[in-house]
Amino acid sequence: MRRMFGDCQVLSSMAAMAGAASSADALFASPLIPNPALAGFMSSSAAMPFHHFSNAAATLIPKEEGLMGGLHVAKDEGMDLEMDMELSGGSGSAHLDGLLSFADVDDDHKPQHSGHDQPPDAAQPSGAAGGNAKKKRYHRHTAHQIQQMEALFKECPHPDDKQRLKLSQELGLKPRQVKFWFQNRRTQMKAQQDRADNVILRAENENLKSDNFRLQAAIRNVVCPNCGHAAVLADMSYEEQQLRIENARLKDELDRLACIATRYGGGGGRQPVLSTSALSCISAPPPVLMPPLDLDMNVYSRHFAEQAPVMGCGDLIPPPVVPQHDGAAAYMGAMMAPVQEQDKQLVVDLAATAADQLARMCRAGEPLWVRQRGAEVMAVEEHARMFSWPVDGAKQGDGGAVARAEGTRDNAVVIMNSINLVDAFLDANKWMELFPSIVCKARTIQIINHGAASGHLGSGTLLLMQAEVQFLSPLVAAREVVFFRYCVHNADEGSWAIVDFPAEGFEEGLLQASVVRCRRRPSGCIIQDMPNGYSRVVWVEHMEMVGEEKPLQPVFRDYVASGAAFGATRWLSILQRQCERLASELARNIADLGVIRTPEARTNMMKLSQRMITTFCANISASGTQSWTALSDSTQDTIRVTTRKNTEPGQPSGVILTAVSTSWLPFTHQQVFELLADEQQRCQLEILSNGGSLHEVAHIANGSHPRNCISLLRINAASNSSQNVELLLQESSTHPDGGSLVVFATVDVDAIQVTMSGEDPSYIPLLPLGFAIFPATSPSPAAAPTISSSTTTTTGNGNGETSSTPPRNSSSNNNNADELLPPNGCLLTVGMQVLASAVPSAKLNLSSVTAINSHVCNAIHQITAALKSSAGGAGGEPASDQ
């Protein structure tokens, strides 16, 4: 047993020292140094008597903590220190780098030695055993032992008792030795990590100091751009600096409010539309002052009619330091938003005004709405008399001149409830999926108000959005618009209103120069729930063309001017078809013919076809990202060609050549659709089928019309073998008012197997071709287009005019009966795409352009000939030229 007396241990096992008289000099290797502070204590025998131990008593040796302090630390990396008492946190072992280890004393009081150490009796004379007793207390671990423990330490720095016991048995050590080695090693690693972190922090501190010195030197050298003198006054007191900051802020507030009052007041005696609450919100100072150099109108992204006054030297002072924390980051993020906090109340007031105007326009009749060609067209002059918009950018002179206005209204019943419709309108991605053939791009720039429910977009939601709308032809420029979208629920009527209104002054830096800029006047839809999951939608579309419009081809002048290209009827027809398609996707009682066996395979096939439609529509339109080229200088040439380099998944990688042509045909769009959607009739067109046959192997119905479906066709089923199968994915869609689509693309058998197995089909490459057909009247009442053998041309008087009241406003034929006739023809857009080269960096060969141009011309000629043949020559011939 071990007994503890003060700073010494009594070990009964040291019987070898029995013959010698124990003294202080014999017990310790170094002489004792008397402590004056303890002189009285040591001399007082009554306080604590001290007697030498007899020979039978154990030898006194110092505690291991004291022994550690007296030992000279060995610097060999293979030594480790072990203590009889477990030290918490490895205290004291870190100084020895975990290299020394004391041997334990077993129950028989015999010291343990490593294999290469000699026994103490053989290594030392017996007379020197007392002086060298401490050298028997440690030994060096072998290189093998250290290597094994290091290997386990890398895997598990904190081994449990079982792991330590197993390792000690393998290495011939005691578990306590293994335990203390790991403890010392962890302490050593922590110390090394602390030193490394300290070095990194010191380096960062030095960099920050150098940056601070550099910025201070730059501030001292600031020169006023107006007078050329130093902009910093070194002798300025802190109080004076604060006064100048406050003075600059008040000047900025005064100038900004003056600009806002002038801008939104309307001038000419009109009362300002700003309410007291809006003014109080606008005049609220920001939480952190911006640098005075930025205290002009450029702080706000809006465009103001007046500029801030030029500041002199006295106004340029060192900017206040903005603390770097989450609040400062949020403030800087808010400053980058188009709508600042002080402007939000104004936008909310405008949203309420727009919602009220939309509701009144939906309820109004004549004289606001005039029926022309079966559609309701807005009388723009009557609208201007009935409704006034508080923020009129065109009248203020900073929004650009209005070249033309379009206003239409329509209503329909869709197979979707109001909640799902509202959710789709408030999500930019879902909105694009709901209108794939008209919305090319859409994004939400800023969420101004989240609505009534916290964190959920619902009633009261106010968004700032940007969109690019397209017509499926490169001959009609895409339109880009930045607008606010406001959603409000009328609990009394049980209806929802989605209203868009112009973002006057907030679209700075958001618009592209390559597309037509539009101003979206209060427009939108009112959604009323009906039984069985249906909804009734009343749609109002009101757009203004800003600035100078690009000249249109004669075939499109009347069509675009009447509002048919971007009007309410087209929006509603697309909405009806997509809702019908989504309902069929969710239905489980529709029988699918062919190889489609599971609901997952059916859903994946519909997703793949939807992506094919979206890709086709985006690739044949005049989007701002595409540049189209005419191959001739003739104004009658309607073929446009473009190339693009693709490296993204979903389409073939390489150089893609696209050719598109749009022409007017004197056949109804249903006649043309039936010809192109029927694969058996299309096979008669040699240019489209290459003489091959098509056999349907799968069919998915996605609408009430029998031609609203998705088909998987096998090309030349009789000739190709099972090892060489060619497949064609086709979707056809039609609407009586909105037009028709026939889109198809070749797919690999492996891709179809991936789709059928339920895997993600988004990476399957598709290069779609197809046709877009829209009902339209003849481009001119006096002349119709003529189809030649080489190209498609359109002849007419070329004098189509555009005015603010669609359609064409000509005094000579304002009351002409032809103005009220329904469409007697259609616009056919043919789009073809080929992979010109599989290398994205390859140069385009001119022969490829010539070949695809000839292919498009021949396709239009064969389609026209087939339509004439099917019509039997009666009512199908184009009108002769005048």
UniProtKB/Swiss-Prot annotation:
One of the Pfam families matching this protein, by short name: Homeodomain
Compartments reported by the entry: Nucleus
Bias (Basic and acidic residues) ranges: 107-119
Compositionally biased spans, kind Basic residues: 133-143
Domain START: 340-584
Disulfide topology: none
DNA-binding region(s) from the entry: 134-193
Region (Disordered) residue spans: 104-144, 782-820
Annotated Low complexity bias: 782-816
Single GO molecular function: DNA binding
UniProt record similarity statement: Belongs to the HD-ZIP homeobox family. Class IV subfamily.
Protein role: Probable transcription factor.
Protein name: Homeobox-leucine zipper protein ROC3
